[in-house]
Amino acid sequence: MSCKKCCSSSQTKWILAGSVSMTLVLAISMILGLTLYQRTRPGCENDAVCRPDADMLDYLQNIGQISHRDGLLVTWYHAANSKKEMEAALNSDVMVLEADVTVEGFNTANETEVPIMAHPPAIYSDNTLKEWLEAVLASSQKGIKLDFKSLKAVGPSLDLLRQLTEAGRIRRPVWINADILKGPNVPISTEVNATQFLALVQEKYPKATISPGFTTLYVHQLPNSTYTQAMVETMEELVRALPQKVTFPMRAVMTRAAWPHFSWLLSQSERYSLTLWQGASDPVSVEDLLFIRDNSAPHQIYYDLFEPVLSQFKQLALNTTRKRTFYTGGSLIPVLQQPKGDGLEVEWLALEVNDKGRKAAITVPDREGMILLDVGLQEPEVGNPVPVLRTPGGSVLTLESCLLHLAVHATRWSIHVNITEPAALRPSLATLAHLSTLGHLPWPVWVGATVSYGSFVVPGHIAGRELLTAVAEVFPHVTVAPAWPEEMLGSGYQEQMVTEMLELCQGLRQPVSFQLQAGPLGQSPANTVARLLAFSPRATVTVYHSSAGNSYADVWAGLWAARAVDRTRVYYRIPQEYRKDLLAHVDRHRPSSRTGPSYVEGFPGESR
């Protein structure tokens, strides 16, 4: 009996021990499974985006990490260098891992060629690049950004990346970063050699996104300069001919002040984007971030920022009902035109100005569009000349009061200031500069005039050089909108006239919209619009209508000639009846393979 009891007791213990062991195994399996699921998530299935040179947003959208192509949705982990930090990063829900690469024992007697994960001044690490990549590739789908702190680490690291890619193991975007130019406030040169860095990438691992940056210094309590036009242009020149996608890392606290340069930079190629980063103690302004957000496409800017700035910014940025502030020198996209949208979407509007005794009252348009202001000059009895708008009844309205009246409305507008007499140019620009400084110009602004230059010199019009010089000196943050004198257009826009206008605008950093009359354009060489648009990535053409001596057929030939070249970069300053007919005609013939300059079949309003 005692034996049975002993055996029974022993059996019970083994059963209990077995149950506990099974429970423990199941628990461990579940934890490992959940961890592995958290790390891997759905795999990347589309070969077009599952590659080192893929667009980061396309990749993250493909694997279900983001819902649409918006750099604000991407999350980052900084300095995932040591094995402890790497594990923490891998177990987090961030989308892109950022880590620093140098060589072991950098600049000491113990230096080797082994790439390790460390940020200066550290020159040793418990993690080599090879170990880091093995861990990241085996247990996550996270994007990779490698920041190279020394040129010596670049070659061996790219060799390793190439080997892993050729083995089919790197199926995600890889960004290769280095600071290759001396930037703001830096007293000594510490940057990686630009020529050698870019050459190594082309030679050893060209299938990646390049992230070339500036060395920077920012001290909150001291005066700080920002990125200059020369810096930005030098950087763009270095990467212009490269085939890769390029994302420029820019210090967020300095970016708003240099926005005119970055607006220009982003317009130079669809391959370009910015990655805004924040130093640990940088006082980044949410207002500045919102301005940058408002004046760029969502896919053009990544935001690598600290809390609480990131959450505060994201909450406001994703609020679709907030009032936005646009850069005066920026594009009509997205203010009035959708990205890649038809320029015909943009409507030119006129203010309704009513005479009331000696004063004029404004009735603002009830819809969004480009507001055309024809500006002259009034010589007061005392004081400086004042730029004004004149009414049919003889009253005058100052340009400043008009713009202030428009600024209080929430409607999206852009402003086209058309200078009608030479003496009004600089006073008008001074008014624009003053209001912009006060924050009363929250939209894109065009400044245009009929210019006199070369073979189209006509007395009474603004000298072409004076228009560009005045803009550069008084208020450069505008789109320049030059037109040819009507007196010279009897035979259309002849090649010499187009060539001379392009010569006049050579070196212009502002966007330019060449103003073309529809009638004369219909009599011009077929390549006229194409030549003007080829002037720069920011060049556009505005076709306008003048009733003076133009046949109906010539007008519509001009409109269709412009549409045949490019529908996103051509605008139409034409009367409402023409615009309605053109819209209706476009709708009736969409889609159409007949897009040549001569395709004017069935002019609106014309019997066939």
From Swiss-Prot:
Residues 588-608 are annotated as: Disordered. It comes from the Eukaryota. InterPro entries: Memorin. It is found in: Membrane. It is a single-pass membrane protein. Belongs to the menorin family. This is Protein FAM151A. It comes from Rattus norvegicus. The gene is Fam151a.
